[in-house]
Amino acid sequence: MKVIKGGIVYQGDGWRYNADILLENGKILDIVPSGSYEGEQVVNVDGCYVCPGFIDIHIHGCAGRDVMDGSVESLEEMAKFVAGHGTTSFLATTTTSSLEATRNSLKAVNEIMKKQSQGAQIIGVHLEGPFINSRAKGAQAEKYILPASRDNFAELVGEYEGIVRRITMAPDIEGAQELTEYLVNNGIVVSMGHTAASYEKCIEGIEWGMSHATHFYNAMTPLKHREP
């Protein structure tokens, strides 16, 4: 048994002070007053806060590395860096780029997911684009924006569809409904973003299965008194 000893532990209903966390085979068995148990492995945290790790669902890069490098080495360095800041898993997030660059990035993520052992775990890919509205492209490259369609999605991800966990898409572009329904039916979270959609169109998107918003208030139209 492993014991994380003497921590300030956050649970859903509040904080427990001077507490020990008992672990077996990577799972929490119990949280008890400090000193109640000894383990084969003891990690003394001496009054530090102990919380569940963060899951980052939108990260393009860090530590001088970028998901679009298309490099396993870059992803490994990212994973080590974010682990030091409390993130235990993340979705490697692409930008709206060329087919070749996107495929190279997906290939690298696929490779690291098979063998990764250090740092935060990469649990899949978040595709930010290319199915977005050019009016709200933000930092995305307009020349690589594509109409939403199952064919374009299939061409973009190729054999790596299985690692795509999340995609940012504008509900107000051609083909958005059909592609959204396909993605949701295949277990991929569809998030509204980079959109000039009206309130009514956003409600339609929710009805199709869109369930999140990407960097809310950024890359979208401003609120107006007659167009909320």
Task: Describe the residue ranges of each PLM region.
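N-terminal metal-binding scaffold of metallo-dependent hydrolase/deaminase domains
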Residues: 1-37
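Divalent metal-coordination and catalytic microenvironments
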Residues: 7, 21, 26, 47, ...
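Divalent metal-dependent hydrolysis catalytic cores, especially in the metallo-beta-lactamase
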Residues: 60, 76-105, 120-133, 160-172, ...
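Active-site mouth loops of central-metabolism enzymes
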Residues: 61-73, 139-146, 189-193
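Charged helix-capping and loop-helix junction motifs
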Residues: 71-74, 105-108, 149-151, 226-228
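Active-site core of metal-dependent hydrolases
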Residues: 158-228
